Amino acid sequence: MEDPSNPQPNQSNLSQCPPLATAPTPAPVRGPYHRRAHSEVQFRLPEDLDLSEPFGGFDELGSEDDLFCSYMDIEKLGSGSGSASDSAGPSAPRSDNPFSAENGGAEAGNSRPRHRHSLSVDGSSTLESIEAKKAMAPDKLAELWVVDPKRAKRIIANRQSAARSKERKARYILELERKVQTLQTEATTLSAQLSLFQRDTTGLSSENTELKLRLQVMEQQAKLRDALNEQLKKEVERLKFATGEVSPADAYNLGMAHMQYQQQPQQSFFQHHHQQQTDAQNLQQMTHQFHLFQPNNNQNQSSRTNPPTAHQLMHHATSNAPAQSHSYSEAMHEDHLGRLQGLDISSCGRGSNFGRSDTVSESSSTM
């Protein structure tokens, strides 16, 4: 505090005090809008660049890549600089640091601020080269904290942000590598499955072709068998026609004649039995008439008194039995011929049988 009684301080006291560092030029007043709006429309120089010192050439500013990298780092850390400064504040040296003002002022005067270097956009630089460019010794950082605490905080925040960015990048690379390995494994599995499916498809296609060929062969064999059966049927019919067993005109009625032949033997047997009974009755009537028309009355009387006995009638029937059996055999033979020739000879045979029975009865009556 100045003494109001001594408005002019002692010059010796002033000479003993170390020279104070000049206060930094205050930044121009910005508008109410966000500071990042300026970076989106125009390029601005970094704030840590000291324009008051003499310009030594473009080599001291660094390359265009360095300027662009610093610009990208400042824009990236604009939103998180406050929190980073709060976290770095307690650990960073403050105005009451052990460094004296004299050393700080001298070193600050001798040291020249350098341009910051950061990661390049393509990320081709290594960590060693980055640290070599942007690293600052702790004593210099302490001196800078005395001179420009805002700049020191920004440097610390940039270092922390670079470390976090590097960590995120490493994690992202690891994740991409893991995804690539997973996709390669899936591709290998799918390739194996595709090979199996292709082999199965090839096998099924060949089997399908073989089955189609076998089906065609079976169809051809069936057609050949049908044609062979037709030829055999025609050959059998031709042989029958050649041997005379079946005439061409009666070939159509061959099946019906065979069915009639199966029924004719039973019908012929019953008809012949009925015919024998009828013949026996006719024989009795004729015998009775014969005795009635005898010229001799004595004989008529004797015949009346002594009629033919049953034994005589049976003897007469037995004597006529061979003729009747012969007629039955002839009728069966004629029936067989009628079946082969498709003619109804059975009725004719029966008619002839009746004719023969009439002849036998007439011969017996003449006797």
UniProtKB/Swiss-Prot annotation:
The lineage of its organism: Eukaryota, Viridiplantae, Streptophyta, Embryophyta, Tracheophyta. This is bZIP transcription factor 18. Keywords: Coiled coil, Cytoplasm, DNA-binding, Nucleus, Phosphoprotein, Transcription, Transcription regulation. Residues 82-96 have a biased composition (Low complexity). Residues 150-171 are annotated as: Basic motif. Disruption phenotype: Pollen morphological defects. One of its GO terms (molecular function) is transcription cis-regulatory region binding. Residues 166-245 form a coiled coil.
